[in-house]
Amino acid sequence: MDNNTFDARYNLAPKAFRHWMDGKLDLTQSTILDFGTDTGVMALGLIQHCKVKRLIGVDINENHKNLLLEIRGRLNFSTLPENLLFKHIEPDEPLSQTFADEIIDCIFSWSVFEHVNQNLLPTAAREIAKTIRSGGYAFIQIAPLYYSAFGSHMDMLIPQPWSHLTTQLNLYQNQILQAKKNTLYAEETDENFEKIKESFWSVFATLNKITANELLDLFLGTGLNLIRQHRTKTAHIPPSELTAIYHEDVLTTEQIVCLFQKN
């Protein structure tokens, strides 16, 4: 994980969450579930910056097992905090059953929902709504959104905006798999860099293409109430060949952050 990504996960996202929850939830007395915790860096950041009472990180992978290795040389931890727990879940696992004995005050999800399989999106949203307690919250963020300038998530290999929408699919795959090392990957072995590119392609191929409005509709459809939303725009100007096909707002909205509350 490069330093910019680490900073975004450990510092930026947890601090943004703390700001949004100010005056709404006493985080020091709350149990937070990090949906899509991955390496656990963000979960650790939530504990450090938000002082949450308890943090449960869940994901379909077990990358959290490398958390101490990931933070080595960056943070001074020899062991993980006792109030930080991780659990591996299956993609279609019902959260509400898994955590039936827990009181979940808020579910936090940062740059995760664009990776949920399309056919599981309604179930995932519904289970989040069922899992949080009455009066609890769901904090959901996506960036970059698929149709935005770098919604491909491939900008570290292909820096041209909207290239994933203007390039034939097999040609775009070739661009990814044949990309040359840049300064970010200069120290990677050739063998490892090839694996990195293959993993990048897998990420792109499994993006669900959800839009900001679709995300709102998805969660509002569960019965949750929208408390607040915030959208950010790209500074890039979409080409006319795309604005002739897509709504400009869909092309330029790169991030949505929304906070929902359960009755």
Residue positions per predicted region:
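Conserved class I S-adenosyl-L-methionine
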Residues: 137-180
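A conserved beta-strand element that flanks and buttresses the S-adenosyl-L-methionine
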Residues: 108
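C-terminal lobe and adjacent flexible extensions of AdoMet/dcAdoMet transferase-like proteins
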Residues: 214, 218-263
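Class I SAM-dependent methyltransferase Rossmann-like catalytic core
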Residues: 1-25
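Acceptor-substrate binding/catalytic loop of class I
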Residues: 198-212
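Class I SAM-dependent methyltransferase SAM/SAH-binding core
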Residues: 41, 45-96
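A short glycine-rich, Lys/Arg-flanked "PGG" loop and its adjoining helix->strand segment in the class I
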Residues: 122-134
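Conserved glycine-rich SAM-binding loop
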Residues: 38
